[in-house]
From Swiss-Prot:
ATP binds at G9, P10, T11, A12, I13, G14, K15, T16. InterPro entries: Dimethylallyltransferase, IPT, P-loop_NTPase. Keywords: ATP-binding, Magnesium, Nucleotide-binding, Transferase, tRNA processing. Its EC number is 2.5.1.75. Residues 34-37 are annotated as: Interaction with substrate tRNA. The keyword Transferase applies. GO terms for molecular function: ATP binding; tRNA dimethylallyltransferase activity. It comes from the Bacteria. It comes from Lactobacillus acidophilus (strain ATCC 700396 / NCK56 / N2 / NCFM). Its cofactor is Mg(2+). Signal peptide: none annotated. It catalyses: adenosine(37) in tRNA + dimethylallyl diphosphate = N(6)-dimethylallyladenosine(37) in tRNA + diphosphate. NCBIfam families: miaA (TIGR00174). This is tRNA dimethylallyltransferase.
Length: 306
């Protein structure tokens, strides 16, 4: 079974820097496991590796789609599988790096994602329309009635995951939680999780947002705002919709920046919750442990030789 190393963790923890360093030392190449970094038109808000960083180690699934393209988790899995095969053919180690837990899980494990077809799109649209009319709580209540086990694992505000579960239930006629139980590994994988003191992570998130504002964050958000009538996944990304009230003249820029920091901190918390509950992870602290990288390398070597 093909070996795949995965590096996961909350936003701003330092996944990119560590992954590049590990790839250089372990003869690896990087596959992005982030649902938003595939889009070409946005750089700052998606926290992609810079062009200089990408020049150090080859990256896959970065800048390979337009924000106007339809892109699902199945598309990601199909493309990532091809990337892993390509890396492996070179005799190198595929290193999956990302913060989108469901995407990472769907790639590393066999999951019944199904084909994207007109029926699926129609079912998904049904729940999107319901959400707009009734709100996240009522949407979640429907899932709770259909599949309490699945609902218990999905926070009420996380409408995207709720809609995904309802869509799968509609498409297959089976409970989402029962299908999750049938998961089996697609690869021989090792997942390295990065985490640290919560307040330090929050401080780094706030600092990152401030830096993003100096790199063109507002211009990217304006581009998304100007195209918001088109239905595309990037509208769900934290970093863009927080600025819409500013463009509408409803809030100050300062208030929107504060809202982005708050949303990013909440997202980091949700990321950690998913990783802890859904994936078998070896945890390390890159911010407080000076020997963190070497410990990870030792763990990877042990896994590679096992």
């Amino acid at each position: 079974m093909q070996k795949v190393l995965a590096i996961v963790g909350p936003t701003a923890i330092g996944k990119t820097d560590l992954a590049i360093s590990l790839a250089q030392k372990l003869n690896g190449e990087i596959i992005s496991g982030d649902s938003m970094q595939v889009y070409q038109e946005v750089e700052v808000g998606t926290a992609k590796a810079t062009k200089e960083e990408q020049a150090k180690v080859k990256h896959y699934l970065v800048d390979n789609r337009s924000v106007f393209d339809e892109y699902s988790v199945k598309d990601f899995v199909d493309e990532a599988k091809k990337a892993i095969s390509e890396v492996a053919k070179k005799g190198k180690l595929p290193i999956l790096v990302g913060g989108t837990g469901f995407y990472v899980n769907a790639l590393l494990n066999e999951m019944q994602l199904g084909e994207r077809n007109d029926e699926e799109r129609g079912t998904s649209q049904k729940w999107e329309d319901y959400l707009k009319e009734n709100g996240a709580e009522k949407l979640w209540q429907i899932l709770n009635e259909k599949d309490p086990t699945a609902a218990a694992k999905i926070p009420v505000p996380n409408s995207r995951r709720t809609m995904r579960a309802l869509t799968v239930i509609d498409r297959t006629g089976k409970k989402f939680s029962e299908q999750q139980k049938k998961i089996k590994p697609r690869y021989d994988y090792l997942i390295i999780g990065l985490n640290s003191d919560r307040q330090e992570i929050y401080r780094r998130i706030n600092l990152r947002v401030d830096k993003m504002m100096g790199k063109g964050m507002l211009e990217e958000a304006k581009f998304i705002y100007d195209n918001r009538d088109k239905e595309h996944q990037i509208l769900q990304a934290i970093a863009y919709k927080e600025f819409f009230p500013y463009f509408d003249g409803e809030k100050s820029l300062e208030d929107c920046v504060t809202q982005l920091k708050t949303a990013s901190r909440r997202y980091a918390k949700r990321q950690l919750t998913y990783f802890r509950n859904q994936l078998p992870i070896q945890w390390f602290d890159p911010l407080n442990d000076l020997e963190c990288e070497q410990k990870i390398i030792n763990k990877v070597r042990e896994w590679e030789n096992g």
